[in-house]
Amino acid sequence: MRAYHDLLTRILSEGVRKEDRTGTGTLSVFGHQMRFDLADGFPLVTTKQLHLRSIIHELLWFLKGDTNVAYLKENGVTIWDEWADANGDLGPVYGKQWRSWAKPEGGTVDQIAWILDEIARNPDSRRLIVSAWNPADLDRMALAPCHCLFQFYVADGRLSCQLYQRSADAFLGVPFNIASYALLTAMMAQVTGLKAGDFVHTFGDAHLYANHLEQTHLQLSREPRPLPRLRLNPEVRSLFDFRFEDIVIEGYEPHPAIKAPVAV
């Protein structure tokens, strides 16, 4: 995970001070890319402990097309609570856009199902793209999509994924995002009969909040440990059939967690 540490180091050394929507203030760089070969291990940050339950359940929640936090809360995940309304609703956020993007003439598009079908039909397609950035729905979303567009790529029997993230909370959010999309890539690879390839993470505004700088220095003082391994239940052949117990991370031995406030 040196690539992640390099991102943190770059923001600290090159970042410009910017104001932001939350009023917290940030150090920010514009344009950065990381690449992880998933054959080398599962890219889970080891210099602080991450809450695996939240990462896995959030991805399953996205794939269900759900936009209410009830499922998350039932499974001990609170990462979306600050943005939910009194009924637990978040508006047409990620799950809605991934699974039922509204068409202007009526009806919806299931982008994830389309990708699965297109990989089977035409693995060389350059249209294997999912977007969560729907300008018509932004005003009704509790939080505009930060990780807003991703593309799959098939070559030599390997499935790779590139994510474009317009806004990236480098200390709290990015470790979750890396793990989530690496997991999605591995799950997609299994159900399409491919091997997991690279996960490429491309950023627009990558930033550290002003109240995360001390924690970032602490994390950078720690030596990364060997990456864990992901084990998926080989019996699962449909992406939408994956359950929490089908996803196991083995050999994760991180440094202790580092607490930091969430900018809302």
UniProtKB/Swiss-Prot annotation:
Query: Any one cellular component term from GO for this entry?
Result: cytosol
In terms of PROSITE patterns, this protein maps to: THYMIDYLATE_SYNTHASE
The task this protein performs is described as:
Catalyzes the reductive methylation of 2'-deoxyuridine-5'-monophosphate (dUMP) to 2'-deoxythymidine-5'-monophosphate (dTMP) while utilizing 5,10-methylenetetrahydrofolate (mTHF) as the methyl donor and reductant in the reaction, yielding dihydrofolate (DHF) as a by-product. This enzymatic reaction provides an intracellular de novo source of dTMP, an essential precursor for DNA biosynthesis.
What residues does (6R)-5,10-methylene-5,6,7,8-tetrahydrofolate bind to?
Answer: 51, 169, 263
SUBUNIT field = Homodimer.
- Natural source organism: Methylorubrum extorquens (strain CM4 / NCIMB 13688)
The reply to whether DNA-binding figures as a keyword in the UniProt entry is: no
Q: Family per UniProt?
A: Belongs to the thymidylate synthase family. Bacterial-type ThyA subfamily.
- The organism sits in which domain of life? Bacteria
Q: What is this protein called?
A: Thymidylate synthase
- Reaction catalysed? dUMP + (6R)-5,10-methylene-5,6,7,8-tetrahydrofolate = 7,8-dihydrofolate + dTMP
Q: Which residues bind dUMP?
A: 21, 126-127, 166-169, 177, 207-209
Q: Which Gene3D superfamilies match?
A: Thymidylate synthase/dCMP hydroxymethylase domain
- List the PANTHER family hit by this protein, alphabetically: THYMIDYLATE SYNTHASE (PTHR11548:SF9), THYMIDYLATE SYNTHASE 1 (PTHR11548)
